[in-house]
């Protein structure tokens, strides 16, 4: 991982109040990073407002929704206020929160290679498996250690973005050392696992079954494609969307190099999630349509009907999975 830039430490030292903001449609790494950094800043004597546009549709982060404001609160405004944006590098990714953000200095902290960060401080480390590890590095660079509660948040985020360490390889010893620090500080891997994988509704399992049934092979099975319709979401509810396990099941199919799940947001707009093995750069495909993410996990929002979006995205896999690849 890259060292914490001195200008970020100076940025934190110079300001007294922080709007700690994450991306819309937050996940465990985003929420865990915000909660841990916010807690550390508070016990360092800083004012903190945690902001998220939501929605908190993932069951594992739903218990934390009440800790976040969907807007930047006016009462936190001060001359020494600043914003720290976590797990994304564009104000366009923070949703409606951006409309309430006053003209303050901004620091971006992210681990996605694709981005357009333009702030007073930009700390991007695409070698970091999770932003929570970058937050741990910031805490340590400021001479601190995470509390038990902060360690729980950080381990939760780390487990989220690494698939509970499934996505790590032999070059990941630094990550396991960091995880060991968090466990030593009181974080429980067992609690993190149950938070990530427990509490699912029966409806979510039924929706998963339908989505699996619809999966169709492309490129001789190297790409598996499925979708979730508006009718599905009306029938099973938004809280039933549980794509992480679905991706695992699809990628476990012999010969599968990538999985794509398309979710209708309206008749003219779809959210697309991509998961891949080493052969495919999902982040590059997503970026070509205005999205972003990592090589192995990425996403985007695309205008168009379900079939139109599906065929556009399937064609984008040609350089990786086509006959001439």
Sequence positions of predicted segments:
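A generic local secondary-structure boundary/capping motif
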Residues: 9, 72-75, 95-98, 122-125, ...
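Short, motif-level signal for alpha-helix interfacial/capping segments enriched in acidic residues
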Residues: 2-7, 87-89, 139-141
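Active-site cofactor/cluster-binding pocket
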Residues: 65-121
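Hydrophobic helix-and-loop "lid/oligomerization" segment in the mid-to-C-terminal part
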Residues: 2-25, 32-62, 77-80, 160-288, ...
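An acidic intrinsically disordered interaction segment
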Residues: 1-7, 98-107, 127-135
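Short, glycine/acidic-enriched loop or turn micro-motifs at the edges of active sites
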Residues: 26, 30, 88-90, 113, ...
């Amino acid at each position: 991982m890259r060292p914490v830039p001195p200008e970020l430490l100076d940025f934190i030292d110079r300001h007294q109040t922080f709007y700690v903001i994450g991306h819309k449609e937050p996940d465990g790494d985003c929420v865990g990073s915000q909660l841990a950094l916010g807690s550390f800043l508070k016990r360092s004597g800083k004012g903190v407002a945690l902001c998220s546009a939501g929605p908190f549709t993932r069951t594992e982060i739903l218990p934390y929704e009440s800790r976040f404001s969907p807007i930047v609160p006016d009462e936190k405004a001060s001359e020494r206020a600043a914003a720290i944006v976590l797990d994304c590098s564009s104000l366009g990714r923070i949703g409606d929160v951006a409309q309430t953000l006053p003209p303050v200095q901004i620091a971006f902290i992210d681990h996605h290679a694709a981005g357009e960060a333009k702030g007073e401080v930009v700390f991007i480390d695409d070698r970091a498996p999770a932003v929570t590890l970058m937050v741990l590095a910031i805490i340590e660079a400021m001479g601190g250690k995470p509390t038990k509660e902060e360690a729980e948040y950080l381990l939760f985020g780390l487990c989220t973005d690494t698939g509970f360490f499934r996505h790590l390889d032999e070059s990941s010893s630094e990550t396991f050392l960091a995880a060991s620090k968090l466990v030593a500080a009181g974080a429980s891997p067992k609690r993190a696992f149950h938070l990530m994988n427990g509490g699912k509704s029966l409806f979510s399992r039924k929706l998963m079954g339908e989505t699996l049934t619809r999966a169709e092979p492309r490129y001789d099975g190297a790409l598996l494609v499925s979708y979730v319709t508006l009718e599905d979401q009306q029938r099973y509810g938004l809280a039933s969307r549980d794509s992480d396990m679905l991706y695992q099941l699809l990628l476990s199919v012999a010969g599968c190099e990538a999985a794509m799940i398309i979710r209708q947001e309206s008749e003219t707009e779809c959210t697309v999630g991509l998961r891949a093995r080493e052969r495919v750069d999902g982040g590059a495909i997503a970026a070509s349509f205005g999205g972003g993410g990592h090589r192995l996990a990425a996403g985007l929002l695309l205008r168009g009907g379900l079939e139109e979006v599906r065929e556009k995205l399937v064609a984008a896999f040609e350089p990786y999975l086509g006959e001439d690849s």
